[in-house]
Swiss-Prot record:
Protein name: Urease accessory protein UreF
Localization in the cell: Cytoplasm
Organism: Azorhizobium caulinodans (strain ATCC 43989 / DSM 5975 / JCM 20966 / LMG 6465 / NBRC 14845 / NCIMB 13405 / ORS 571)
Family according to the record: Belongs to the UreF family.
Organism taxonomic ancestry: Bacteria, Pseudomonadati, Pseudomonadota, Alphaproteobacteria, Hyphomicrobiales
Keywords: Chaperone, Cytoplasm, Nickel insertion
Principal place of residence: cytoplasm
Subunit structure as annotated in this protein's UniProt entry: UreD, UreF and UreG form a complex that acts as a GTP-hydrolysis-dependent molecular chaperone, activating the urease apoprotein by helping to assemble the nickel containing metallocenter of UreC. The UreE protein probably delivers the nickel.
Domain of life: Bacteria
Keyword Cytoplasm: yes
């Protein structure tokens, strides 16, 4: 049976497509409170951006997203839609603010719909029927990757790196940081992101938790920020 008949994508190409800026999930519309951090003076240059993002990825939502993705992947590998629903419910409940819930759920539902349309799979149809409208982004990515045979280690690294790049791209639009400086930030964060991806398979759902309180408070304040480019 050919790939065209099964709809199964080659692993690497699937990740390039699914996590590219051009994939229709609307990632460009969200800053995960970076817009508020720039307005408040927390992010003013290359160094402060790197520090903020390092904390977000290692102590905040990056680590949490990785854990959720890995467990959604496990549910997909086992064909266990009820387990997937439990992981998704935990993911949505952990969103600390309305805007961050919108950020993950809008992207998650859009991702699920786009993959179902272009890379159909019965497991994706089952998930779409069983899950509520709110589907967390890492949950959708992990589940789809498992169904289509993308290695867990590869999707963890790719997802976390893609999120990092997306946030750096957002920062370039709201802070006095140039493209070369942003590229340096991405390069310096790569080893930490790769190490995080390697650690995540040893973690359980009981290890979920974040310690980025100022970013969470910033997301709340962003809801009433006077001038905004981003939805979060």
């Amino acid at each position: 049976m050919t790939m065209a008949e099964t709809g199964a994508p080659p692993s690497a190409l699937a990740l390039f497509a699914w996590l590219s800026p051009g994939f229709p999930v609307g990632a460009y519309a969200y800053s995960h409170a970076l817009e508020w951090a720039a307005e408040a003076g927390d992010i003013t240059d290359e160094s402060s951006l790197e520090s903020w993002l390092r904390d977000l990825m290692l102590l905040g939502f990056g680590r949490a997203d990785g854990i959720l993705l890995a467990h959604a992947y496990g549910a997909g590998a086992a064909g266990d839609v009820p387990a997937l629903a439990q992981v998704n419910a935990r993911a949505v409940a952990l969103s600390p603010t309305a805007e961050l819930r919108l950020e993950t759920c809008q992207q998650g539902r859009s991702f699920l719909d786009a993959v179902r349309a272009a890379w159909p799979h019965g497991g994706l149809d089952a998930a779409a029927a069983h899950l509520p409208p709110d589907v967390a982004y890492p949950v959708a990515v992990g589940y789809a990757a498992a169904l289509h045979g993308v290695p867990r280690a590869a999707v963890l690294e790719a997802y976390l790196f893609a999120v990092t790049q997306t946030l750096v791209s957002a920062a370039l639009r709201i802070a006095p940081i140039g493209q070369t400086a942003g590229t340096r930030v991405v390069a310096r964060l790569m080893p930490a992101v790769q190490a995080l991806a390697g650690d995540i398979p040893t973690l359980t759902l009981d290890d979920l938790g974040t310690a980025t309180f100022r970013a969470d408070l910033g997301s709340m304040r962003h809801e009433t920020q006077y001038t905004r480019l981003f939805r979060s």
